[in-house]
A protein has these predicted regions:
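Amphipathic alpha-helical interface elements
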Residues: 1-134, 138-228
């Protein structure tokens, strides 16, 4: 139910706008992160015409098809690169996407299912994330009304759940993809499950600045770092 004071009382309006903004920011990043994590599992970074691509990118395959059609040649023949890219993309689509019916958020839903199948998230967490997606849609499409209604403890729990699951997916990605790809070794005694990605740290910092009154603390730390 709309509460008129939520629009005109600063002590009500500002926190509600902060929650809405952070919720949407976190969710959009979370969805991108989920999709990219699964894509990276199947893909290989590559360069073409001086531009970085993933070998399963449609843009990369389209560009290779154009070069093959025009009869261009390369150090590795473009026909071979095209065949490899098509094969890699077909495996990704079969294992991550084809099990999900076409519709809104198909790539995201397929990626969540893949993470569940590989024991990165649980079935309950998968269902929870899809429910959070529904809440995100409410905020994006009915933001004016939702600010008028205000936010509940359940919205705070949704934010906490996203932060928690995101950190765990990033830790899994670090162990399964990044460590071997970048030849990273953790210090002795470090727990790889506790690893936080740069995005985890930034989003946690934003949370603490917005909701925990730690803006000055982060400002001072940044100022000290910039002096180095």
């Amino acid at each position: 139910m709309l509460q008129i004071e939520n629009y005109f009382r600063e002590e009500e309006l500002v926190p509600n706008v902060k929650v809405a903004a952070y919720f949407i920011l976190l969710y959009e990043h979370f969805e991108d992160m989920v999709i990219e994590t699964v894509r990276e599992f199947y893909s290989t970074p590559c360069m073409l015409d001086g531009k970085p691509f993933s070998n399963i990118d449609k843009e990369y395959i389209d560009l290779l098809e154009k070069k093959v059609k025009q009869g261009e040649s390369g150090w590795i023949p473009f026909k071979i690169r095209l065949a490899d890219a098509r094969r890699a993309r077909a495996v990704y689509q079969k294992e991550a996407l084809d099990k999900v019916k076409k519709g809104s958020g198909r790539i995201f839903r397929g990626s969540l299912n893949w993470l569940q199948e590989h024991d990165v998230i649980t079935e309950a967490e998968n269902d929870r994330i899809l429910a959070i997606r529904d809440r995100r849609n409410e905020l994006v499409h009915e933001l004016f009304q939702e600010i008028g209604k205000g936010f509940s403890d359940e919205d705070a729990k949704r934010i906490a759940d996203m932060l928690n699951v995101q950190q765990r997916i990033n830790a899994w990605k670090f162990q399964q993809i990044d460590m071997s790809l970048m030849e990273i070794e953790l210090p002795e005694g470090a727990n790889p499950n506790d690893v936080m990605g740069g995005d985890d740290m930034i989003l946690n910092a934003i949370f603490r600045i917005l909701f925990c009154g730690e803006g000055e603390k982060f400002k001072e730390a940044l100022d000290e770092e910039l002096k180095k």
